[in-house]
């Protein structure tokens, strides 16, 4: 009976140790696959969008960016400003506004509206009040992400 209990304890300790050892690798693989799927889904929705809708979204974002330049003294956006912000470049309704690709580190990450904790747990956040990522003069787009989250390793 003692030998049987010792064997069970040894097996449990081995499985626990193996799980702890494999967790970083499995977690990294899982998060990479999740990011790839999210970006692929977003890309597919953008591809299916009508060209007029795409152009209208970009024009709206450029207009928003122009408004930021004229309101540069305001640091706290109003509720209507936030509502407008979250509606721009939100093609698939998930809050994702695009993605960033860094070929040198084989990294493709979703960019979401805002830098709330819930957003930063799953991807990169765009800082409200900074320019939307559509380019142009006098634009400064700020994104934020964590490198060493327990749930995801971004920019690595």
Residue ranges and their predicted role:
Residues 3, 7, 13-156:
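Solvent-exposed, non-transmembrane regions of membrane-associated and secreted proteins
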């Amino acid at each position: 009976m003692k030998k049987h209990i010792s064997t069970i304890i040894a097996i449990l300790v081995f499985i626990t140790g193996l799980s702890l050892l494999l967790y970083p690798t499995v977690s990294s693989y899982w998060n990479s696959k999740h990011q790839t799927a999210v970006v692929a889904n977003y890309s597919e929705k953008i591809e299916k969008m009508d060209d007029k809708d795409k152009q209208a979204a970009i024009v709206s974002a450029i207009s928003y960016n122009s408004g930021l330049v004229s309101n540069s003294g305001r640091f706290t956006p109003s509720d209507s400003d936030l509502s407008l912000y979250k509606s721009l470049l939100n093609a698939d309704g998930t809050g994702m506004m695009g993605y960033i690709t860094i070929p040198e580190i084989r990294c493709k990450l979703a960019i979401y509206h805002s830098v709330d904790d819930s957003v930063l747990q799953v991807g990169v956040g765009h800082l409200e009040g900074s320019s939307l990522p559509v380019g142009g003069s006098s634009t400064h787009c700020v994104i934020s992400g964590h490198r060493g989250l327990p749930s995801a390793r971004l920019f690595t």
